[in-house]
Curated annotation (Swiss-Prot):
Topology versus the membrane: Multi-pass membrane protein
Organism: Acanthamoeba polyphaga mimivirus (APMV)
Keyword list, A-Z: Host membrane, Host mitochondrion, Host mitochondrion inner membrane, Membrane, Repeat, Transmembrane, Transmembrane helix, Transport
Location within or outside the cell: Host mitochondrion inner membrane
Homology family: Belongs to the mitochondrial carrier (TC 2.A.29) family.
Protein function: Transports dATP and to a lesser extent dTTP, TTP, UTP and ADP, possibly across the mitochondrial inner membrane.
Ranges that cross the membrane: 11-27, 60-76, 91-108, 140-160, 166-183, 205-226
Solcar repeat positions: 1-83, 85-161, 164-233
Motif (Substrate recognition): 191-196
Listed name of the protein: Mitochondrial carrier-like protein L276
Superkingdom field: Viruses
Length: 237
């Protein structure tokens, strides 16, 4: 019964978080892929093209990808933790669950990013072939290894100490997002077919960090606090 609860509760929590934070994700994607635009110009550009709906242009693939990704990672992480396999720990369990999930979610992320950029994925697919589905996966793999080894394991560690899901999830998201930001930047640009090298100034690779934090911190806080709330409710029945 517990395994079904892990999947269901994490899926519900992720859908809620994704719907709330999707506009910021669209904003971030456009900002990282338009290096000549300021945040204000980028925001105006999205709105002028499609109005408010432009920020929700990739709703279906975004919700599908994030829901499957988070619920699968959470379920697998819990599964490996409960099995208590030898020679494993929280970080290894997180990495394994993240890599297994990313093989399916990366193609959906590709579709999402093209939609967020107001571009036709099908036209790009005809030009580039089916390899387009996994373009940028090397960056996605690196991002997955880092994020999966940190988010759930770090959250569990912090929550054992603070015993406050809001504080634990907030600190986890800030630390993890800041560390993996350069890979997120490279992944977003690689998927869209843009140049990766932006000079030796590390600041270029942290473009969009504030937007990423604005998206991921509330997303992870909403997800983990909702899971915690639903888990407690489930135990009452």
């Amino acid at each position: 019964m517990a395994k079904y609860t892990d999947i269901t509760n994490s899926a519900i929590a992720t859908i809620v978080a994704e719907i709330i934070t999707l506009p910021i994700c669209t904003f971030k994607t456009n900002y990282q892929n338009n290096s000549t635009l300021s945040m204000q110009q980028c925001l105006k550009n999205i709105y002028m093209k499609n109005g408010i709906s432009g920020f929700y242009k990739a709703s279906v693939p975004a919700i599908m990808s994030q829901t499957y990704s988070t619920s699968s990672k959470y379920f697998l992480f819990r599964f490996f933790e409960n099995k208590n396999y030898p020679y494993t720990n929280k970080m290894i369990n997180g990495i394994i669950s993240g890599i297994m999930t990313s093989l399916i979610t990366h193609p959906i992320d590709n579709i999402k990013i093209h939609l967020q950029m107001n571009d036709s994925f099908m036209c790009k697919l005809r030009e580039n072939g089916f390899g387009l589905f996994y373009r940028g996966y090397s960056k996605s793999f690196g991002k997955t290894v880092i994020s999966s080894s940190m988010f759930f394991p770090l959250y569990e560690t912090l929550n054992e100490y603070f015993e406050k899901p809001v504080v634990s999830s907030m600190l986890t998201a800030i630390i993890s997002t800041t560390i993996m930001q350069p890979l997120d930047f490279l992944k977003t640009r690689h998927i869209y077919g843009l140049s990766l090298y932006n000079g030796l100034n590390l600041q270029h690779y942290y473009r969009g960090l504030s937007l990423n934090l604005m998206r991921i911190v509330p997303h992870f806080v909403i997800t983990m606090t909702t899971i915690d709330f639903l888990n407690k409710k489930t135990l009452q029945y």
